[in-house]
Amino acid sequence: SDRKTVSCPECGKCFTSRTYLNVHKKVHTGQTYSCSECGKSFLSRSHLNTHLRTHTGEKPYSCSECGKCFTSSAILITHKRIHTGERPFSCQECGKSFSYRSVFMEHQKIHTGEKPFSCSDCGKCFRYRSHLKVHSRIH
């Protein structure tokens, strides 16, 4: 990759900017910002401020295509892929592409065979949490 990176002196993880590195360093120091409403902790003040909108209901970022509103610009950018058809996450195994990283990561389990969700009653394992929930109804 041609992009310059900076690495964490503590663990070696690489980042594309010093700003991201500085946020990451808080993992090692334990410095966090906590929500006064629910106690959830964040590594950056901006992530806390975005989270606080879930309590206030504020959604200042709106989609110019459909008018749907969001708590952060990052979520809006991801949402816009619905309208553009952009699918930036491609599977190296089968070529299938995805709009959302989370869906792509779930898809990868098909190829790895990973089944991280197990039934506490019978031990049967599932690839997806939703499949475990459906299965749990039989017990």
From Swiss-Prot:
PANTHER family, per the entry: GASTRULA ZINC FINGER PROTEIN XLCGF28.1-LIKE, ZINC FINGER AND SCAN DOMAIN-CONTAINING
Zn-finger (C2H2-type) residues: 6-28, 33-55, 61-83, 89-111, 117-139
PROSITE patterns: ZINC_FINGER_C2H2_1 (PS00028), ZINC_FINGER_C2H2_2 (PS50157)
The keyword RNA-binding is assigned to this record: no
Record's keyword annotation contains Transmembrane: no
SUPFAM superfamilies associated with the record: beta-beta-alpha zinc fingers (SSF57667)
Domain of life (superkingdom): Eukaryota
UniProt-recorded name of the protein: Gastrula zinc finger protein XlCGF67.1
Protein source organism: Xenopus laevis
Swiss-Prot/TrEMBL keywords: DNA-binding, Metal-binding, Nucleus, Repeat, Transcription, Transcription regulation, Zinc, Zinc-finger
GO MF annotation terms: DNA-binding transcription factor activity, RNA polymerase II-specific; RNA polymerase II cis-regulatory region sequence-specific DNA binding; zinc ion binding
Major location category of this protein: nucleus
